[in-house]
Amino acid sequence: MVYDCFCFFNELDLLEIRLNTLDKVVDKFILVESQLTHSGHPKPLHYANNKERFSKFSQRIIHIIVNDFPEFKNITHNKMSWIRENWQRNAIFRGIPKTAKDEDYIIISDLDEIPFRQKQLE
C-alpha cells in the first residue's frame, strides 16, 4: 500500500492536481483538515464542503478533521501558531491504519510538494 499524507487548508485546485497526478500510484490519500487557521481563527472545512468535486477519489480519501488543539495560557500567539501547525501535521498519523505493514510506503509532504509519479512507479 502507498499512503499519500498531507495537510489541507483551502487549495482545492491544487488538491485536484495532486489527486489526479498520483492516482495510479497511491492507494490511500490521508487529507488532514483543521477547523482553525494556524492563527487560531475558525475556518470552514473546504474539503468537506467540496467533496462532490473529488467523488472519483472518495473511496480512497481518509479525511481527518482536527478540532482538538491544545490550549496553553502562557504561550505567545506566534508560538501557538507553530503549535497548531505541528498538531495538525501530527494528526496525519490518525489516518494511517493500524493494519499498515512495514513494506507499505507512507509519503508525508505539503500539498504543493507533489512527488514525481515516475519515481513512485520504480
Predicted regions and their residues:
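Short, thiol/selenol-centered motifs that function as redox-active sites or metal-ligating centers
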Residues: 8-12, 35-40
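Short alpha-helix within the catalytic core of nucleotide-sugar-dependent glycosyltransferases
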Residues: 16-19, 116-122
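Short, well-ordered loop/turn elements at secondary-structure boundaries
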Residues: 9, 24-27, 101-103, 117
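Active-site-proximal specificity loops/subdomain of glycosyltransferases
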Residues: 36-108, 117
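Short loop->beta transition adjacent to catalytic acidic/histidine clusters or analogous donor-positioning motifs
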Residues: 2, 23-37, 58-62
